[in-house]
Amino acid sequence: EAESSSSASTSTITTPQKVGSEFQVNTYTAGEQTKTNIASLSGGGFVGTWMSNGQDGSGEGVYGQIYDASGNAVGSEFLINSETNNNQDHPSVTGLSDGGFVVAWESTGQDGSGDGVYGQRYDASAAAIGVEFKINTHTSNEQRDIHLASLEGGGFVANWISYNQDGNIWGIYGQRFDSSGNAAGAEFRINTHTANNQQHAQISSLPD
């Protein structure tokens, strides 16, 4: 006597359910608050960042707000960029494995030549760790459109576009950082093909 059995694999798609009502992230409302970016935190909460016009006294500035796992604001919104001259805008944020997070943004004129990209690390309570730091090594012309991704072990990686660094309009560059926020190696070109423009890149970490 032989027994035969068969099974079918099924998957269930769960319909997302809203939790509570929509809420306003920014407290300061004069001018414009735009370009928001959100990252989850390892403790169950999340952090929102955005750029705000005129709030820091000089053009655009970058601000943030922490939320707990229940969606309640933790503390007040806070200014992220220390340099306030000209514009600091278009932020990117990623959570880190230690419960903190890192924010990066474009800053006009700070590196001495057009836009550069800068960052600031925070602990889980939104206290700044160290001072803001320049991410791009090459400073000629423009470096902008910064994106971040966290890495296993507590580090993170950034990518951005740089004007004429590869010899032909826009190219895409990256830089790794260790868990202490120190650059790990040199910045590197990501695109191999350099004719015309390479831009609008995204970044994601892999489990290995």
Task: Indicate where each model-derived feature is located.
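Extracellular glycosylation-rich, acidic/polar low-complexity regions of adhesion-
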Residues: E1-T14
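Extracellular, repeat-based ectodomains that mediate carbohydrate processing or recognition
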Residues: I13-D208
